[in-house]
Amino acid sequence: MKLRKIFLLPLISLSTLSVACSSTDPGLEKAQAYFQRNNIELSKNNAVTFLKKGYSSDKEEVINTVFASWKTTLLDYQLLEKPLDYSRFAKAFGVNKSKEDVTPNISAKGLYFDETYPGISGQIALVLGVKSQKVVNFQYSWKNNLDFKVQIHLKMTGIVGSDNTSTSLIKSFLASTSGVSESDFTGDKANFDGDVIFTYTPPTDNRRVSESTFSSIPASINFPFDIKIDMSTSHEKLNLLLSTNEQVKKIRTRTFKGKSIDLLPFFYYTLL
């Protein structure tokens, strides 16, 4: 069976195959079928080759397959919430990687705090200490490389201030914000729920998705995006800080241009 024609397989021909993917996305099923039927080693390089050749014949289905693997890994497999299967995770994302390297995630790294708060990004992360995070919605659409959108909604629980350094920083925020006091964040009142929405759209520079997006050396899918991050909370006083404090309100809505995200680990993870 030729690689470039695997994306044209009718779904009925796959009905008797056992596949590891929990998603019903036909592209993921076809990818599993290809490696199983042809007894091809499931390596990152072979996965990239499979996608790159498929992209040359059916761009829409290949991109939707890549997006579906991203969704499956985060929403179905609950990669951010569940304890890691370290062997599987290391094969897909790398031996020195952690959940903070998964895109998206709610951490100083995942929220690009270093670009918003250079020099104090770690302290800001402690001010909004993350206790849990969960992907609750994942939507995507693709028409062409100038018209696509991925939106991922995470819910989090957190605590305002988790050490002496972050407490001092909070006090400096409070000193410049009327209507909020330190007592608003003591005891149980320090706990909060939040919503973080990551929106990925075509980059505004000249980078475009193409066959070169699928690279064999090193094996990667370097997908170009502009990223918008929106954060909100139901905590009344924290919401006041997010609305009025000059430093804190930077977190509320931020846009990052010229980003690239390697989506190969998600595709590979779904096939392992």
UniProtKB/Swiss-Prot annotation:
Entry GO CC: plasma membrane
UniProt xrefs under InterPro entries: Lipoprotein_3 (IPR001595)
Signal sequence segment: 1-20
Lipidation (S-diacylglycerol cysteine): C21
Source organism superkingdom: Bacteria
Keywords recorded for this protein, A-Z: Cell membrane, Lipoprotein, Membrane, Palmitate, Signal
Membrane topology classification: Lipid-anchor
Lipid-bearing positions (N-palmitoyl cysteine): C21
Subcellular location: Cell membrane
Main location: membrane
Recorded family membership: Belongs to the MG439/MG440 family.
Protein name per its UniProtKB record: Uncharacterized lipoprotein MG439
